[in-house]
């Protein structure tokens, strides 16, 4: 029976020769992930199960990243709860401040996700690891609890949409523009409980950072997961970051897809998602005159070293607009250190931007950049729902690091070509 890439991974982890869409299966897990918001709830449910230990001390990862460094007493209590649980259960992959980072940048960096894995995380953007040719998806805290106790999870096998990427990207266009373009095409429910499977010669043109960004936002189209084929770039990344063995799965040529969508990368311009939904996209030349108050460059979507290099290229030798608060979040300590070694932090600081420790921060309206009533932000984050970054009457425009950096300089949503 012909299967998609996702179906092959799920079949293997279910101990089955084949699976078909709609089938309910029990799957063995390679990693169970949680953060400082979702894990306390999972701990409560885990304790109800009555298990004295997690299924595997090295296959559970907990990353306090949303409200860390602790923003208030309540968040400090949550992190204390998580910290004590990790110590009590001898969880090896607990990442304290100083080692932590934004979880979906940190997990691949630490080699905890490799090709062919099945990963669940109590965070919707767990789908990021599909960039490595893994099946990864977000779940609720109760599913995380069950996963920690049993090492297994139930899934309904998803159907798939095939995205064939062709051509090469134009200057200043990145993975963020690709996924915003796709979400603008199909809508936020356009891939509902489907696997978004990316293929085509254009995949080879994309950096791993681009692939992480695209897979990260598959959930914004309603997808169960997003996944890329494994190529030389993938293998190089995995070998650089992990000593684990891995398995490469390929979709069968005659696998069934709900539909196939062709994407010409050369025709995608810098793209911006307007409030208050990621599907509300416009190309940069359709934006018009929109003044802004804040720029956020970072998050699990666009806080990697490649993203910071692009932002620095735009900001080098320039000053951010005096009316724009510009906040930059390296996604992990390692990325922060690399940015320092490359002189990127100096460029940011000299431009008038501020550089934060790794944290999700303002992305979810947590801290470190909350918007007031009537304020607008350009952000490299993944969601722009009403009140997402602060006041319900604030606005968030989603864009790439290049567009965000250019907008910081001009004080309005701008193409990098206007600045560089």
Curated annotation (Swiss-Prot):
[4Fe-4S] cluster binds at residues 300, 360, 363. This is 3-isopropylmalate dehydratase large subunit. Binds 1 [4Fe-4S] cluster per subunit. Heterodimer of LeuC and LeuD. It is an enzyme of class 4 (lyase). Catalyzes the isomerization between 2-isopropylmalate and 3-isopropylmalate, via the formation of 2-isopropylmaleate. InterPro entries: Acnase/IPM_dHydase_lsu_aba_1/3 (IPR015931), Acoase/IPM_deHydtase_lsu_aba (IPR001030), Aconitase_4Fe-4S_BS (IPR018136), Aconitase_4Fe-4S_dom (IPR036008), HAcnase/IPMdehydase_lsu_prok (IPR011826), Homoacnase/IPMdehydase_lsu (IPR006251), IPM_dehydratase_rel_enz (IPR050067), IPMI_cat (IPR033941). Keywords: 4Fe-4S, Amino-acid biosynthesis, Branched-chain amino acid biosynthesis, Iron, Iron-sulfur, Leucine biosynthesis, Lyase, Metal-binding. PANTHER family: 3-ISOPROPYLMALATE DEHYDRATASE LARGE SUBUNIT 2, HOMOACONITASE, MITOCHONDRIAL-RELATED. The lineage of its organism: Bacteria, Bacillati, Bacillota, Clostridia, Eubacteriales. SUPFAM superfamilies: Aconitase iron-sulfur domain (SSF53732). It comes from the Bacteria. Belongs to the aconitase/IPM isomerase family. LeuC type 2 subfamily. Its EC number is 4.2.1.33. GO terms for molecular function: 3-isopropylmalate dehydratase activity; 4 iron, 4 sulfur cluster binding; metal ion binding. It comes from Clostridium kluyveri (strain ATCC 8527 / DSM 555 / NBRC 12016 / NCIMB 10680 / K1). Its cofactor is [4Fe-4S] cluster. Pathway: Amino-acid biosynthesis; L-leucine biosynthesis; L-leucine from 3-methyl-2-oxobutanoate: step 2/4. It catalyses: (2R,3S)-3-isopropylmalate = (2S)-2-isopropylmalate. GO terms for biological process: L-leucine biosynthetic process. The gene is leuC.
């Amino acid at each position: 029976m012909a299967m998609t890439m996702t179906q092959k991974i799920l079949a293997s982890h279910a101990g089955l020769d084949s699976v078909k869409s709609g089938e309910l299966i029990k799957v063995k897990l390679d990693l169970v992930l949680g953060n400082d918001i979702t894990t306390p709830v999972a701990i409560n449910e885990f304790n109800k199960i009555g298990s004295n230990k997690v299924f595997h001390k090295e296959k559970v990862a907990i990353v306090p990243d949303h409200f860390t460094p602790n923003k208030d007493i309540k968040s400090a209590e949550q992190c204390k709860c998580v910290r004590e649980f990790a110590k009590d259960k001898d969880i090896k992959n607990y990442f304290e401040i100083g080692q932590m980072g934004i979880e979906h940048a940190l997990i691949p960096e630490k080699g905890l996700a490799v090709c062919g894995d099945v990963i669940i995380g109590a965070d919707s953007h767990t789908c990021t690891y599909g960039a490595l040719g893994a099946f990864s998806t977000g779940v609720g805290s109760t599913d995380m609890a069950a996963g920690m106790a049993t090492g297994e999870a139930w899934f309904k096998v998803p159907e798939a949409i095939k995205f064939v990427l062709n051509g090469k990207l134009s200057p200043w266009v990145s993975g963020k523009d690709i996924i915003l373009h796709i979400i603008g095409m199909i809508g936020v429910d356009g891939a509902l409980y489907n696997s978004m499977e990316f293929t085509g010669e254009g995949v080879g043109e994309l950096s791993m950072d681009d692939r992480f960004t695209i897979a990260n936002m598959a959930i914004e189209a309603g997808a169960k997961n997003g996944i890329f084929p494994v190529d030389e770039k993938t293998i190089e990344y995995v070998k650089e970051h992990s000593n684990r063995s891995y398995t490469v799965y390929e979709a069968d040529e005659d696998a069934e897809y709900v539909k196939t969508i062709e994407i010409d990368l050369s025709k995608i311009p810098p793209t911006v998602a307007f409030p208050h939904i990621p599907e509300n996209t416009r190309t940069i030349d359709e934006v018009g005159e929109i003044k802004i108050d804040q720029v956020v460059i970072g998050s699990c979507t666009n806080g990697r070293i490649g993203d910071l290099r692009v932002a620095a290229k735009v900001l080098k030798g320039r000053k951010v607009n005096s009316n724009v608060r510009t906040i930059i979040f390296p996604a992990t300590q390692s990325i922060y250190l690399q940015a320092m070694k490359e002189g990127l932090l100096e460029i940011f600081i000299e431009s008038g931007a501020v550089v934060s420790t790794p944290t999700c921060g303002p992305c979810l309206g947590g801290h470190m950049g909350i918007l007031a009533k009537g304020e607008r932000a350009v952000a490299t984050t993944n969601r722009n729902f009403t009140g997402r970054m602060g006041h319900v009457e604030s606005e968030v425009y989603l864009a790439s690091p290049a567009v965000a950096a250019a907008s910081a300089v001009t004080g309005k949503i701008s193409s990098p070509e206007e600045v560089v």
